[in-house]
Amino acid sequence: MKRYLVVALTVCLAFTFNFSTATGAVKAGAACKKQGQVSISSSLKYTCVKSGKKLVWSKGVAIARPVVAITPSPSATPSPSATPATLTPSPTPTVNSLVECKLPVADGRGDVSIGGWPRISERSKVLGDVTATVIMVDFPDAPATMTPAEALARISPAQDVFKEMSYGKLSYNLKPQLKWYRMSKNSSDYVSGGWTFIKHRDYITEAAKLADSEVDFGNTDSLIILANPDAKGMGYSGPAFSAIRGSGITLDGRYVSNGATSAYDLNDWKSIWLNHEITHTMGLVDLYASTTSDRSNRYDGLRYTGEFSYMGLSSYQSNSPGLLAFERWNLGWIEDSQVECVKSSQFTKLITPVQISGGTKAVIVPISSTKAVVVESRRASGIDSAMSKSGALVYLVDSSIQSGLGPVKVFPSDLVNDPRYLKAPRALGESVTVEGVTIKVIQSDASGDTVEISK
């Protein structure tokens, strides 16, 4: 979407008029000498007129100052009058500045957020080449039996996923030290009582120091500690390392504030574990529910977004694990020119599938300073090849809500009949209303979904 800046410039022009110019102040009703005489004073034009038996100055008339509007096609027809014409203003646009759709960081955490333009300063690079140093560790109670190369193969597909999600804008490059380093304590000792930030950082620091004599961390952007996948004592939570306020680790003169450590659940999630955790280090939040609402519902953790986005509870085999358009926009993988921020009462737009590059990727309707309705198009392709229903996906983003508590909610929501949100995308003729905004699909084909938005 091209946007042009319209600048108004006041232009001072010198004109030659067939009248005299007064050197002193002129007042309406004051006596003048010659009928028809014209005088200019304080940007007002006065004419000497007959009033009864007297000649007096008429009421002053403002002299128009010409204004030139600079536009892409400045072709205006001058008025036949002495005053240069102004260009006719364009109709009020239906698409507004993106400012209102770029939701702020407003959840009070400080390390990750669904909002943020600009992004949180200590989060990882998201464009170009990112070097991820991989250190492999095992434990006295769980010595590795697989080779380092076999362990690396568990996470290496994540590189291609990042390339797909970013439309080739991010090259996340694993740089492994293919050697097992033995940690000083049993695996369960590190996670006993649960991870805290300090315990997690100490674990990473110990692993890095074990390898320091053989590894140059000078170019490290992201640090991965890959634990022996057979170490059950590491539990089922391999968290991201997202330091803030200078609390990261300095290695070989390089400050490192982003990374991740694996756990036993790597065997279940496989390399999408790395995509999920590293995307935290890029600043994004958990979309799955971190609290329990209904213990009888086995899909309770999916109650906000179902199986959309791998920032929820999505594996490679899930319905549609590709990142949402809003997430990709926040990371700079979708350009501003591919987003429409709409405040008009009615708007129609073709949205191209998020799975392919090019075209409009999202239509966003701001609701408040922290909340917006987003519409995107999804198709069964690439990482989303298992998607059961294509169409326009509608969701509400609220940057005042913290990670895991529902910062994104997909609609329509039917937790009884569709707890995985498999039927959520709107097909041709289907609609949904969110926050007073109605979205209806009026055309759908391989090129995407044309939606009509009204409120």
Residue ranges and their predicted role:
Residues 43, 129-131, 370, 389:
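Extracytoplasmic
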Residues 31-33, 47-49, 100-105, 340-342:
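Sequence contexts marking disulfide-bonded cysteines in secreted/extracellular proteins
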Residues 217, 222-224, 230-384:
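Extracellular hydrolytic enzyme modules, especially secreted metalloproteases
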Residues 93-269, 273-275, 431, 440-443:
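Zn2+-dependent metallopeptidase catalytic core
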Residues 128, 303-305, 388:
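A short, structural micro-pattern
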Residues 52, 61, 138, 229, ...:
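A mature extracytoplasmic/lumenal domain signature
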Residues 2, 6-95:
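Polybasic, low-complexity, intrinsically disordered segments
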Residues 102-107, 113, 145-146, 240-264, ...:
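Non-catalytic C-terminal accessory/binding modules of secreted extracellular proteins
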